Amino acid sequence: MSDTTPQASPPGASPSSPETHVIDFRAAEQLLAARDPRGALKLLDSLIAAHPESMSARLLRARAFFASAQLRSAALEFELVLEREPDNAFAHFALARTHERSGRPVQARKHFRLAAALDPQPDYVAAARFEE
């Protein structure tokens, strides 16, 4: 880890305390933003082991998988989020991007269109290509 890597689990904090989990989540966000998805995954794996129902942690882990080109793992994680939150437009859009990057255009188009239908923001609508 570099000197600029966010430190997880402050001294004196229990490895499984709620405070530690929040710090680890925020550190994972920072690592992903700093283009260190593998570092983010290390923090998120233990966080999700402690809180498997946390969809925000799972969504962040899916993004980290995508950023590190672990596309199958990313797709599985996005699908898990969508099982619990079928109206999550971002998860549909991100799953579509994952399918697109994996060379599965039919599956990608389906999720691009679902994302645009749930949240008609310009990026989602453009990707859905409704005119085709």
Cite the ranges covered by each PLM segment.
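Canonical tetratricopeptide repeat
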Residues: 60, 94, 128-129
